[in-house]
Amino acid sequence: MLTFSGRDYLPTQMVPADVHIEDVAHALSLICRFGGHTEVHYSVAQHSLLVARILEERAAPVEAQLAGLLHDAHEAYIGDIPTPIKRALGAAWGDLEADVATAVRRALDVTFAFHDWEDLIKHADVVALATERRDLMHFDADRNLPWRILGGVAPFHQKIGALGWSPQWWADVFLDRYDTLRSAREAARLPHAA
């Protein structure tokens, strides 16, 4: 397969050297959440930024915020498949997704942060899901099937805004947030002067 930047990669043989943040940001800004069944175009990049924002507001460490921003980065290479379809595809899909996610997390240096903060990131992801359902979908509790994963989870207090911008704008915002969080993480890793 060919990336936005013109590089070849094989999803079944993904290695960290195949991963480039510009390709990730570009692809995620174009991939729609929920198979496109939202009121307006809403991308995985926007979702990822929301997850990072939720983590920031909850005073999560910078490493957790960065891992939250990149929690779906592997979808830049294999797409965003809605969860009910993933379940129907079974182990073959799960294995492929896990392998690609591992390569992407290694390349972007968030393997340990994702592991260390996995529960916090997953909770922020579910809060984002509840927020997206509230703000972007025509959900009616009396008409639609329940979303069991959202049981007891409240949406984020802020409504999703700034929806009319182009995918390129969202890719740029994603890259800016990535650079900011990565720089903050690196600064925190430096030994402090006495």
Region locations from a protein language model:
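Metal-dependent phosphohydrolase cores
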Residues: M1-A194
